[in-house]
A protein has these predicted regions:
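Short, charged recognition helix plus adjacent turn
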Residues: 10, 31, 40-41, 56-69
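Long, compositionally biased, intrinsically disordered segments
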Residues: 15-16, 30
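Recognition helix of helix-turn-helix/homeodomain-like DNA-binding domains
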Residues: 23-38
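Short, basic-rich loop-to-helix N-cap that marks the start of a DNA-contacting helix
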Residues: 35-48
Length: 69
């Protein structure tokens, strides 16, 4: 389990809920959780949406999410 997935589940969010709030596809969230690279702006949106539920900011850099340009 990735740190991102752990935080998402601790926040009580499903993949679908987070993808809707972050305005990214379910596939993007699934890739992040499988430690596959995604575009940096999408990773940032996912982290911003997750941060709102956690009550503190997390970034894709600190979570080690792999990104491509």
């Amino acid at each position: 389990m990735t740190k991102f997935e752990e935080l998402r589940t601790n926040a009580g969010l499903t993949i679908t809920q987070l993808s809707i709030e972050a305005r990214v596809s379910r596939a993007t969230i699934e890739k992040i959780e499988k430690n596959q690279a995604v575009r940096a702006p999408l990773a940032a949106r996912a982290c911003t949406a997750l941060s709102k539920h956690l009550g503190y900011q997390v970034t894709y850099q600190e979570l080690g999410i792999k990104t491509v340009r």
